[in-house]
Amino acid sequence: MSETKITYDDFNPHAFETLDITDETKGAREVIRWAYDVYGDSIIYSCSFGAEGMILIDLISSVKKDAEIVFLDTNLHFQETYDLIDRVKARYPELNIKLKQPSLTLEEQADQVAPALWKQDPNQCCYIRKIKPLEEVLSGATAWVSGLRREQSPSRQATNFINKDERFKSVKVCPLIHWTWDDVWDYIKAHDLHYNELHDFNFPSIGCIPCTEAVSGNGDSRAGRWTNSTKTECGLHTTNKP
């Protein structure tokens, strides 16, 4: 694997096409090691603290113990998510875990934009509470890590290990692209990792309270998000603006 730094302006889409993905982590450990060796302090992991996030935190901490981990705190998350963050902080005390707040409180958003904006215009709500905060976080970074997997949804099937991120004009590193949902849980159980307790109650994907529901039956691992809506992404991984 090349030690050359890949940037947004000097992007090489073919850098990892020959990577061996037959190891336990399907290439994830090697991609993470490369990313932190090359980018150092100029790479940030934006973590939602979902199941995939627990794996990435575990792998990242083995490479860079003081890595910067940012949680986009919309002020609309489940208490179980905040409890998980506290448990993760206790297990990995050297990690630099930060909670990034939006510029508007929920009360200010209701007054200045609309009450319960997530009902009237969920794209705008995600833009204010997630996309803009991440833009601020990444303003000084060259690259960021994401837990996207190809299996998660049709919109994510073309994701590569290294991606030119047009939304944030950055490089997006996605170490888990080849993992299945079973792979995720096999690793969590094998390494006795913490995870959000809502996963035990039929929540495969966990976001903000108003936009997340438990699911019944089989579906992709994004099921339960924005139910009865055509919306499938918060916007962090698309180039469309609200």
Curated annotation (Swiss-Prot):
Which residues does UniProt mark as catalytic? 234
Q: Which reaction does it catalyse?
A: [thioredoxin]-disulfide + sulfite + AMP + 2 H(+) = adenosine 5'-phosphosulfate + [thioredoxin]-dithiol
The record lists [4Fe-4S] cluster as bound by: 125-126, 208, 211
Q: Spell out the SUPFAM superfamilies in the cross-references.
A: Adenine nucleotide alpha hydrolases-like
Q: Which cofactor does it need?
A: [4Fe-4S] cluster
EC numbers listed for it are 1.8.4.10
Q: Which residues form the signal peptide?
A: none
Q: Which GO terms describe its cellular component?
A: cytoplasm
What is the first-listed, main subcellular location in coarse terms? cytoplasm
The UniProt keywords, alphabetically, are: Cytoplasm, Iron, Iron-sulfur, Metal-binding, Oxidoreductase
Which GO BP terms, alphabetically? Answer: hydrogen sulfide biosynthetic process; sulfate assimilation, phosphoadenylyl sulfate reduction by phosphoadenylyl-sulfate reductase (thioredoxin)
* Record's keyword annotation contains Iron-sulfur: yes
Cofactor, how bound (note): Binds 1 [4Fe-4S] cluster per subunit.
Q: Does the keyword Cell membrane apply?
A: no
Query: What Pfam families would the database entry show?
Result: PAPS_reduct
Gene Ontology MF term list: 4 iron, 4 sulfur cluster binding; adenylyl-sulfate reductase (thioredoxin) activity; metal ion binding; phosphoadenylyl-sulfate reductase (thioredoxin) activity
Q: What are the subcellular locations of this protein?
A: Cytoplasm
Q: Which domain of life is it from?
A: Bacteria
Which pathway, metabolic or otherwise, does it act in? Sulfur metabolism; hydrogen sulfide biosynthesis; sulfite from sulfate
Family listed:
Belongs to the PAPS reductase family. CysH subfamily.
- Function recorded in the entry: Catalyzes the formation of sulfite from adenosine 5'-phosphosulfate (APS) using thioredoxin as an electron donor.
Q: What is this protein called?
A: Adenosine 5'-phosphosulfate reductase
Organism, per UniProt?
A: Staphylococcus saprophyticus subsp. saprophyticus (strain ATCC 15305 / DSM 20229 / NCIMB 8711 / NCTC 7292 / S-41)
The gene name on file is cysH
